[in-house]
Amino acid sequence: MHPPHTHNINSKKGMRTYLRTHGTIAEIIMWRLLKSRQIHGVKFRRQFSIDNYILDFYCPELRLCIELDGAPHFTEMGRLQDKCRTKDLLAIHNIQTLRFENDMVLKYTEWVRSKVLEAVSLCKLDGSIEDLVINPYILD
């Protein structure tokens, strides 16, 4: 007996397609950085669903998720949902999550790219991004 299929299930296809075609400017910029294996030759997928979650960007090879956060993520409820989602992805699927605010992608694109490169390198090296420090306040 096969385990239940949890990745890119058909019931989420319409929402994935909608999110791909109605993405934020930050998502468009991030996709330009990630697509075509530009980051250490690894493949990222855009709007990839796992269980009830749709991940902004996902690298199956490294089990690495990149999420871009806009205004809804800055509320108390948004922060709580993000924390639960990150915890679930790690506990259930062994997927690590790297988060950036949309504004960081817009204002500090090269810095964000360097952090993604660093995360991918860490994942390839020992499988963990636990020690990766993302501190946007050093940029101002």
Regions found by a protein language model. Give the residues of each.
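Solvent-exposed, charged helical/coil patches
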Residues: M1-G41, K124-D140
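Basic, amphipathic alpha-helical patches used to engage nucleic acids or provide basic targeting signals
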Residues: L19, I28-I29, R46-L122
